[in-house]
Each structure stands twice: as structure tokens, then as C-alpha cells.
């Protein structure tokens, strides 16, 4: 093997290894989550860690952000944040969505095809159920939800918010 080929192989190994470590690193620790954010999970810690590993292994964090962090540096995709998503959708909805062979039929996207939510129908049923349970557990404190809705209303209408 030539010297240049060896260097290229080492570079590839570093990139692949770094990507794998990044996916392991994105399983948030309690310390990282405890930043005074208005988001929380209702799952027991052991279940949450198991679900976070599924989220990480299925590259959800490549596009979606969570716990006030950013999505992976590997892709720049305008995917929705997952913080508080369980305050909007329930476990049954998430399970149906993750089980669909065509998630676009349930929740259409205007993103380019390569950035659209992939189907997770081929995952084992237990994994989809764990992910759905976890996503449904991601709540947002009521005061924050009210303030967010108020800001969105005022932004869209230009009028003061009146519940």
C-alpha cells in the first residue's frame, strides 16, 4: 500500500469513527438536560435512556434537535425541534406515524425528497413503540407553550394575542 493510500484510509477511519462517536455522544446526560429549559420528559430515567439510544441509533438527531441543543453538524436540515412535541401529539399518533410506510401521507412536508422524514416501518414493533412513547413523553411547561403560541399569533397576524 502506498503512502498516500494509507493516509486516505486513516482519514476515512477518523471520519467514520467520529460519526459513530457523535451518535453515541448525542444521548444527553441529565446534566446537559438540566439547563433551566422549559422542556421535560415524563418517562422514568431508565426508559428514557433506552429510548434516547434508539433515537441516537436511528439518526434522528441528524435532522432534529432536542433539549435545546442543535441537530447534528453532519446535516443542515430544517426539521422540527422535538422539544415539547409530546404536548402537541400523543403516543398513538407517533406510533402510527413511525409505522407508516409513507409518513408524508400523515404529515406532508414541503422539504426536498432527500430531507423528508424517512419511514421507520421496517423497525421492530417494540422499537417503534419505545420511540413513540418517548416522543409523547417530551413535554413543555404550560407557561412556555402559552408564550410560544402568543408570539406565533402576533407574528402571523400583527395583532395582540387574545386567548
Please identify what each model-predicted range represents.
Residues 51, 57-67, 94, 131-135:
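The canonical Cys-X-X-Cys-His
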Residues 64, 98, 102, 136-139:
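Protein kinase-like catalytic domain
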Residues 52, 65-99, 114-122:
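Gly/Gly-Pro-rich "capping" loops immediately C-terminal to redox-active cysteine motifs
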Residues 68-73, 106, 137-146:
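Inter-heme linker and motif-flanking segments adjacent to c-type heme-binding CXXCH motifs
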Residues 3-26, 92, 118-157:
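C-terminal capping alpha-helices of c-type cytochrome domains
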Residues 4-5, 37-40, 48, 52-57, ...:
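Short sequence/structural segments immediately N-terminal
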Residues 76-77, 102-110:
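Non-transmembrane interaction and regulatory regions of membrane-associated proteins
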Amino acid at each position: 500500500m502506498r503512502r498516500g493510500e494509507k493516509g486516505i484510509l486513516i482519514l476515512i477511519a477518523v471520519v467514520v469513527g467520529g460519526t459513530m462517536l457523535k451518535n453515541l455522544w448525542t444521548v444527553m446526560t441529565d446534566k446537559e438536560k438540566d439547563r433551566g429549559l422549559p422542556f421535560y420528559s415524563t418517562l422514568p430515567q431508565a426508559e428514557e435512556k433506552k429510548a434516547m439510544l434508539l433515537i441516537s441509533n436511528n439518526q434522528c438527531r441528524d435532522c432534529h434537535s432536542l433539549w435545546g441543543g442543535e441537530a447534528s453538524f453532519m446535516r443542515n436540515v430544517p426539521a422540527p425541534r422535538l422539544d415539547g412535541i409530546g404536548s402537541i401529539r400523543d403516543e398513538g399518533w407517533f406510533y402510527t406515524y413511525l409505522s407508516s410506510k409513507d409518513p408524508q401521507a400523515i404529515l406532508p412536508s414541503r422539504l426536498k425528497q432527500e430531507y423528508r422524514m424517512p419511514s421507520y416501518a421496517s423497525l421492530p414493533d417494540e422499537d417503534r413503540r419505545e420511540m413513540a412513547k418517548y416522543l409523547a413523553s417530551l413535554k413543555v411547561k404550560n407557561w412556555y407553550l402559552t408564550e410560544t403560541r402568543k408570539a406565533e399569533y402576533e407574528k402571523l397576524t400583527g395583532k395582540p394575542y387574545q386567548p
